[in-house]
């Protein structure tokens, strides 16, 4: 659906549990699930869906294009990776980054994607990245992903570099996982089911931002009687499920340099509320910035709960539609 | 400090019930094979294997009896770290061959310790995120494929 210039897309990573655990679930099945949600734009992550990476076999690319065409859907963006640690014991240098960037740009171009998502490009290589993006006619977005936050120094330095270089090819892809305010109940339930003490989990959550490092927290929880289940929870809460007060001010600094958004989510209730991520605040900042482009829903609840990706995505799309319709009206009123 | 050992909830697919199979030739039993699935959300280069240790019925399997097969190629465990152009896709198993003359029919306790380097997650020079792909399961020896 397109609401005042903001179009909803879906990252096929949302169907990760299905793809990984069901032997017969294919890219075609993922695209069928996409179509059933009435969404046309999607992101494909190469290292998930291709058997060959960083360069897929031409037949694999052909298969994605054919399956897309017959369903009337479009690969909007390609999820690449800087797998620069693939050579054991080797400290990656510029050549390693350029190799991976080039491989992903080629694949993105072959898929007809307008955007390539990259995980990290060193600042001194960004001018070259912009040049390569011109060669391939593909824009490069650097994902701002938890545990990073938009206000972090390294993100702001990237923003300054984008401004300095001045190429429209370079931009950000903020991932809403940066704005988790508190782990969702299903995430906690999984640790409790694995044997974690609910009180110790609460202690970890309450003291996540007390200045303790991950190791110090682990040590303290061990002293309080915690074990392996709590260690796994700590690793998660200091890693991809890092949480804290949402960095909304930092978020607004990136908006003029944003290619599109990963509208990451973990759980939407039946009442269409996201208890983890402040969606109304994020979406109204996007509308106020005048952004026109794609909001890519990305379900990651499969990281800790049995998946019902289609149901969760349907709720998330409706939640976004509700907020966007309201925000668009508000914005119109404020602009008069 | 960064996330140390990530463990995703796909552990059930590391050692599937039918993963352990006898490996026989017309000359008799040669050993057995074990299929290993990834407990991760994406594929990884084979060189991401940091350590692979197999214990069957509480006996560690000596490294020199093991060969690892991926994409039709065989590797001793000591060479996995060099296999950076081989990609282990998420839906494909790694197959381990153990040349020990075979094991008895019936159930066997299989303990796999498999640590993988997260090749895109560097925290400092030489410091990478690690993925715990280990699993333990009692598997019943199956006939040859």
Feature map (PLM): residue ranges:
Chain B
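Terminal leader/tail segments of proteins
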Residues: 1-145
């Amino acid at each position: 659906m397109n609401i005042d210039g903001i179009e909803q897309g879906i990252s096929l990573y949302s169907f990760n549990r299905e793809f990984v655990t069901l032997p017969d679930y294919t890219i075609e099945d993922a695209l069928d699930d996409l179509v059933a949600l009435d969404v046309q734009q999607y992101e494909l992550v190469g290292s998930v869906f291709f058997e060959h990476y960083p360069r897929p076999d031409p037949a694999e690319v052909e298969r994605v294009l054919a399956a897309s065409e017959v369903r009337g859907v479009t690969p909007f963006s390609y999820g690449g990776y800087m797998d620069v640690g693939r050579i054991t014991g080797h400290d990656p240098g510029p050549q390693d980054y350029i190799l991976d960037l080039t491989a992903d740009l080629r694949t993105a171009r072959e898929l007809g994607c307008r955007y390539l998502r990259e995980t990290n490009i060193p600042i001194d290589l960004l001018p070259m990245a912009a040049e390569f993006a011109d060669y391939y006619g593909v824009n490069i977005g650097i994902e701002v992903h938890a545990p990073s936050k938009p206000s972090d120094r390294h993100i702001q330095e990237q923003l300054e570099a984008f401004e300095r270089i001045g190429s429209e090819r370079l931009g950000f892809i903020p991932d809403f996982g940066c704005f988790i305010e508190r782990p969702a109940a299903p995430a906690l339930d999984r640790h409790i089911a694995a044997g974690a003490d609910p009180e110790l989990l609460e202690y970890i959550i309450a003291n996540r931002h007390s200045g303790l490092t991950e190791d110090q927290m682990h040590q303290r929880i061990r002293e309080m009687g915690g074990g392996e289940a709590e260690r796994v929870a700590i690793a998660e809460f200091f890693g991809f499920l890092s949480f804290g007060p949402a960095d909304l001010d930092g978020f607004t600094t990136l908006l003029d340099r944003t290619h599109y958004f990963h509208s990451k989510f973990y759980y939407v209730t039946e009442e269409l509320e996201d208890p983890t991520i402040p969606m109304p605040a994020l979406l109204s900042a996007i509308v106020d910035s005048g952004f026109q482009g794609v909001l890519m829903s990305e379900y990651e609840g499969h990281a800790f709960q049995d998946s019902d990706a289609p149901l969760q995505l349907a709720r998330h799309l409706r939640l976004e539609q509700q907020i966007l319709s309201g925000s668009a009206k508000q914005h119109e009123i404020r602009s008069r | 400090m960064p996330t140390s050992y990530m463990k995703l909830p796909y552990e059930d697919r590391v050692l599937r019930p039918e993963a352990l199979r006898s490996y026989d030739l017309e000359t008799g039993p040669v050993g057995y094979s074990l299929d290993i699935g990834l407990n991760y959300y994406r594929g990884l280069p084979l060189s991401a294997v940091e350590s692979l240790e197999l214990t069957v019925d509480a006996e560690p399997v000596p490294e020199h009896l093991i060969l690892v097969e991926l994409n039709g190629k065989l590797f001793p465990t000591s060479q996995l770290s060099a296999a950076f152009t081989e990609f282990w896709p998420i839906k494909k198993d790694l197959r381990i061959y153990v040349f020990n003359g075979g094991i008895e029919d019936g159930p066997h306790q299989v303990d796999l310790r498999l640590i993988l380097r997260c090749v895109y997650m560097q925290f400092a020079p030489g410091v990478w995120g690690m993925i715990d792909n280990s699993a333990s399961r009692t598997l019943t020896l199956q006939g040859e494929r």
